[in-house]
Structure formats: C-alpha cells, structure tokens
C-alpha cells in the first residue's frame, strides 16, 4: 500500500487513472488501509480518490478518517485532514486543477510528517449558522471530540488536539462555560486535574500554562483558580482574589479542610500575606488626605 501511494506521489495526476487501473481501485485500497488502522497511508489515498472517484467520495472518506484519527489521538494527521476538508469544501469546483496542484504537498505532509506553517484557522472565521453543511460536519466532529476530552479532563490531549487541528478553544469555552467545560466542584476538580496533568513533568506544566492563558482570555474563574493553583501562580490568584473576597474565603477554607491539599498550604500562606499587603496599600491610598 505504501509503495503504490509513494509512486502516485511522484506521478503526474493525469496518469493516476492508468496507475490505479493496474494497482487496484483507490477506494478499495483506502478501505483496506482504514480497516488495518494504517491511517497515515489511508490519508494519502484521499486526493487520488478525489480525482478518480469525485469530491463527494473523497470527503466521505476524509470525514471517516478524521473521526478515526481523533479517536487514536493522531492530532497532527487530524489537522491535515481538517485543512483538506475545509479546502475541498470551498474549492472542488476546480477539483482537477486543485488535485494536481496540491497533491505533492499534501501527500508529502502525510508521508513524511513535515512541519507546516500555522495559519489562521478557517474554523474561526464564521459562526456555525453561516457555515456550509460540509464544514458543519467537520465542526461537529471536532466539537464532539473537544467535549469528550474536556468532560474526561484529558487536558494534555486537549492541548495537543487544539494545536494539531487549530481548533478554536476560546470560542468553544465561551459556548460551553455551562456545559462540558463546567467544573462542578473546586475540590474534586483540583484533585482530579492534578492527577491527570502530573505537574512534575515539564510538558504537563506547559500544557497547564497553555490552558491557563485561554481560561484567562475568557475570564473562566473556576478554571483559572484550579490551573493557577496547580502551577502555583500566586500573582494570578492574588489578582483574582483581591477583586472577589468571597471566592478567596471559599478557596482558603477548601484548601485547609482537605488533607489531600496540604501541599498547597505554603501557597495559601503566601497568598494571605500578599492579599493582606494589597489590602493595606488600598486602605492607605483611600485614606483621608491630611
């Protein structure tokens, strides 16, 4: 299978019909790769299918493959499929020209995993109601996967998913604040997310920083408190608590009343000192002018 697709990559698209009449039908070869979970090789057949079988068939195959790659956490490959699907949804009126022009580049990505330059995502440009049914299918698959990861607090996978597919996490968080992104209980969330992220590794800390930045951009307090605590970002917590003393009081009581959070008592003491200092400075600045 790899040999056939490698030959196709080096062959002018005008000769693909002859090549696959001898090697076998492209859809059948795609299906065999798909069933064997050779997803990267299967992806290389999609542009061949677009040219030989038509855009509708190739889009159907790409959507199936997108779902499968997400299920296997193959997020770089999923990102390439997303870009193909969005492009094909716009440009298949010129299918033959586009297939010949894009096939070496697209197949090169899939065969050799070469790095790509990040561009602004097409997923950010329109609201759901403005998108075509074809693009809606892509969006629905991506959002369903994001909800699956968020609900299970699989946060490192969520970060990899967002980076690989350029999924619009900010828009998703704004929409799902009371849905799949909601944290029901601070104590259980802090314990579970701490276990999931394993904060003693550099990559997990980088993932947490990535998520914290997004949560701050949408002012998602519950998540900010959890992630800033795990990262011991005292300055973030002080900035939040000095504007919300009720939240500070609840936070302090929770950390002190659960033995599992004893590791954060030093952070709590530092926060108390800093907030007291902030309060004193505020009183001085608001005091009577002599």
Spans of features found by a protein language model:
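Alpha-helical solenoid scaffolds
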Residues: 1-290
């Amino acid at each position: 299978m790899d040999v056939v697709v490698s030959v196709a990559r080096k062959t002018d698209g005008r000769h693909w019909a002859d090549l696959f009449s001898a090697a076998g039908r492209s859809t059948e070869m795609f299906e065999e790769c798909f069933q064997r979970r050779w997803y990267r090789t299967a992806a290389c057949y999609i542009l061949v299918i677009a040219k030989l079988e038509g855009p509708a068939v190739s889009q159907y195959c790409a959507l199936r493959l997108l779902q499968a790659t997400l299920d296997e956490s193959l997020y770089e490959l999923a990102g390439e499929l997303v870009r193909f699907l969005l492009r094909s949804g716009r440009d298949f009126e010129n299918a033959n020209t586009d297939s010949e022009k894009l096939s070496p580049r697209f197949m090169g990505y899939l065969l050799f995993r070469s790095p790509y330059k990040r561009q602004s995502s097409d997923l950010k440009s329109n609201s759901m109601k403005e998108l075509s049914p074809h693009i809606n299918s892509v969006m629905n698959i991506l959002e369903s996967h994001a909800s699956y990861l968020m609900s299970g607090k699989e946060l490192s996978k969520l970060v990899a998913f967002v980076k690989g597919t350029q999924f619009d996490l900010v828009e998703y968080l704004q929409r799902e604040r009371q849905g799949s992104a909601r944290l029901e209980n601070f104590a259980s969330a802090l314990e579970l997310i701490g276990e999931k992220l394993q904060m003693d590794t550099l990559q997990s800390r980088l993932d947490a920083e990535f998520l914290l930045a997004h949560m701050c951009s949408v002012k998602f307090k519950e998540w900010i408190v959890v992630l800033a605590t795990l990262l011991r970002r005292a300055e973030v917590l002080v900035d939040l608590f000095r504007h919300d003393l009720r939240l500070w009081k609840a936070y302090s009581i929770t950390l002190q009343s659960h033995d599992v959070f004893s590791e954060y008592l030093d952070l709590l003491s530092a926060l108390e000192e800093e907030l007291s200092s902030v309060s004193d400075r505020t009183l001085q600045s608001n005091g009577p002018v002599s």
